[in-house]
A protein has these predicted regions:
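Internal low-complexity, small-residue/proline-rich segments
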Residues: 41-362
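N-terminal leader/signal peptides at the extreme start of proteins
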Residues: 1-18, 79-85
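N-terminal single-pass transmembrane signal-anchor helix
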Residues: 13-47, 57
Length: 362
């Protein structure tokens, strides 16, 4: 009997043609182009949510502080400006920032316990533990959307992306900066309580974003010392010689004493400031994210290294369209960068006595 053997027939699979390969590459490119914005949007949404949570935690801390001491912490920086009669001393500094005082209430009591509360953060006579406490980087005080988080403070102090709105210089008529129209915000020097916020806690901003001041060239230091508030007497005191005499060697933003660095959570001027807007020469119609574009500001006169320009001591964020604000009732809202300056004045002032427009929105 003959046996028939079946031979396997090998099938040849044809390869991709060049056209097919190009089509596949094009499809992959289209998918990536479609997915990348969605991924970036999801990441920003997560960062924005974390920023909101930071401010909520700060808000809870502020109210727990108020429960404990029957007043809010000081604004770090305050103002005793009066138009009538006019005076020339516009600023008063506490020994510490708002963010130093609330450390025990943001789960950082171990840091607070290292601090000599009667000495400023740059006073080296208070001992090494005092100085090292202020060098801690605290996630609750930084916005994750800050693109400059890789930059460290040259002197090693912890950074800050929020500040207390202690006053506003926005003119209620023109919407431009006008010192003669200054009014107090929710926090002050000396400290005040809920009762001082006559316009209502839900209508008055307490803390707002100012993100990115830690970037090289983004902020300036300036001789803003006038008088320290004496926490014992609740009166203006004298300058602390140790604080006045310090210059941070190697810090590109520092000059000669008594200059300070306005991006540290320990610094009174970083932790508290006004909402004023830029000078008329650099006015772009916004008090939130002013001069955000082009990146770095408009050269040569409206760049971010100038006071009150961009992220230098004004409301600013890298969230698209606006920034977060913590209100005095503990709520956090996102404010549009298109908000009218006059409305922003009403939101910052604590006792303006005027109603908010019903249609201004957030």
């Amino acid at each position: 009997m003959s046996v028939q053997r079946c031979n396997r027939i090998g099938w040849k699979h044809p390869g991709f043609t060049l056209i097919e390969l190009l089509v596949v590459i094009a499809i992959i490119g289209i998918l990536i182009a479609l997915l990348l914005p969605a991924i970036q949007s999801a990441r920003e949404a997560a960062r924005r949510s974390q920023c909101t949570n930071n401010l909520k935690q700060i808000g809870i801390a502020m109210h727990n502080f108020h429960d404990a001491y029957k007043k809010f912490p000081t604004g770090g920086e305050g103002t005793n400006f009066k138009a009538t009669p006019a005076n020339t001393i516009f600023d008063m500094k506490d020994l510490h920032s708002t963010f130093t005082y609330i450390l025990p209430f943001v789960e950082q009591k171990d840091i607070y316990d290292q601090i000599n509360i009667n000495k400023t953060y740059r006073d080296t006579t208070a001992g090494p533990e005092h100085t090292s406490a202020f060098r801690r980087e605290l996630a609750v005080y930084t916005c994750p959307s800050n693109p400059f988080l890789e930059y460290k403070d040259p002197a090693g102090f912890g950074r800050l992306d929020y500040y207390a709105t202690v006053y506003t210089d926005i003119d209620p008529v023109t919407g431009h900066r006008n010192l003669a129209t200054r009014v107090n915000g929710a926090l002050a020097v000396p400290a005040t309580g809920v009762a001082s916020i006559a316009d209502g806690t839900s209508n008055t901003i307490m803390i707002i974003e100012d993100v990115g001041r830690c970037a090289p060239g983004s902020g300036i230091t300036f001789a803003s010392y006038s008088k320290y508030h004496d926490p014992t007497t609740d009166l203006g005191g004298t300058l602390d010689p140790a604080d006045q005499a310090v210059t941070d060697t190697g810090n590109p933003h520092s000059g000669t004493p008594p200059y300070r660095s306005v991006w540290r959570w320990a610094d009174q001027d970083a932790g508290g400031s006004g909402v004023s807007g830029p000078s008329d020469a650099c006015w772009d119609g916004r008090v939130i994210n002013n001069n955000k574009t082009p990146y770095g500001g408009k050269a040569p006169d409206c760049t971010w290294d100038k006071n009150n320009i961009g992220l230098n001591d004004e409301p600013f964020s890298f969230h698209p369209g606006g920034c977060h604000a913590l209100f005095s009732d503990g709520s956090v809202r996102f404010l549009s960068e298109q908000i009218k300056p006059q409305v922003m004045r009403l939101l910052v002032s604590r006792a303006e006595g005027k109603p908010l427009p019903e249609d201004f929105g957030f």
